[in-house]
A protein has these predicted regions:
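Bacterial N-terminal signal peptides
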Residues: 8-17
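Non-globular, low-confidence helical/coil segments that flank catalytic cores
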Residues: 2-4, 21-280
Length: 280
């Protein structure tokens, strides 16, 4: 843990953050939902959620969304069916939260599409759904889009390796979003030449030792790497080898557990600012 840059560029109280971010064109808040994933992304006035944490951390996610005044998003991406990524989805929609579209990877380990939790949520709450495959592009306003990189093949035994991997490119900068991708999916994407450089990396699989290989980190060369985890839930995260690989790639590192609300990334015309956001 001593390799992590704990003194981020700025630590703010939430109300001040809302004011200070008003001019930013692209921002991503990686929310502290313990050892789970949930990120709120805003680009060109459009808002997206990437994962919804687990049901036990839904209250924190809802509190953050309410504080932002976010009652609807243009899309919710669920990277895979692990409960710490999709667990909050159904209760979030049941609460009246609105989404224009739900997205999930077409390759998954559920017995059928009808058994997929995102499909079930789509049917129950009347939200349209799109299955995503490598090569698909989801526009996000002028000059911006999410490009789906993986998964390239179905891993029937390890749902993490069916994780939706996306590259968000905007005029302000880029983010690589990786779900819980482990080393086998990393290897597939590296072999296919699909791993891009990115300004910001959402570190795969909570910084565990079965992901973020050295070649992957050196290929992405992120300026900042964001790890979504909690050492109470998972004491071995972030793994020292993962931190070493990211450090060798010259990435600064932030961990969601080090902020009450989460880690805010602001991309603004090539400039990059990272802030730890706390409640009052």
């Amino acid at each position: 843990m001593n390799r992590i840059l704990r003194l981020l560029l700025c630590t703010l109280l939430l109300p001040a953050m809302l004011t200070s971010c008003a001019s930013a064109e692209t921002r991503a808040l990686f929310i502290n939902v313990r050892k789970a994933d949930a990120a709120l992304i805003e680009v060109n006035g459009l808002r997206f959620l990437v994962d919804t944490g687990h049901k036990d951390s839904l209250e924190q996610l809802q509190q953050v969304l309410e504080t932002y005044g976010v009652s609807r998003v243009d899309g919710i991406f669920i990277t895979h069916t692990d409960k710490d990524h999709v667990g909050g989805l159904k209760k979030l929609l049941k609460s009246g939260f609105e989404a224009d579209m739900l997205y999930a990877p077409a390759l998954h380990s559920e017995k059928s599409n009808a058994k997929h939790p995102v499909y079930e949520a789509s049917e129950k709450y009347g939200v349209p759904m799109t299955w995503l495959s490598s090569g698909d592009v989801i526009p996000a306003g002028e000059g911006a889009a999410f490009t789906v990189l993986g998964p390239l093949r179905k891993d029937p035994g390890k749902e993490n390796n069916n994780s939706l991997v996306m590259h968000l490119v905007t005029p302000d900068g880029s983010l690589l979003l990786t779900g819980d991708m482990e080393l086998p999916e990393e290897a597939d994407l590296l072999a296919a030449g699909l791993i891009p450089r990115a300004d910001v990396l959402k570190v795969p699989n909570h910084g565990e030792d079965d992901a973020t290989g050295r070649q992957f980190a050196l290929t992405v060369q992120p300026k900042w790497a964001i790890i979504s985890t909690n050492t109470i839930d998972e004491p071995d995260t972030p793994d020292e080898k993962v931190l070493r690989n990211l450090t060798q790639a010259r990435a600064s590192i932030a961990v969601t557990q080090d902020a009450d609300v989460g880690i805010l990334v602001i991309l603004d015309k090539g400039k990059l600012d990272v802030q730890a956001i706390n409640w009052e």
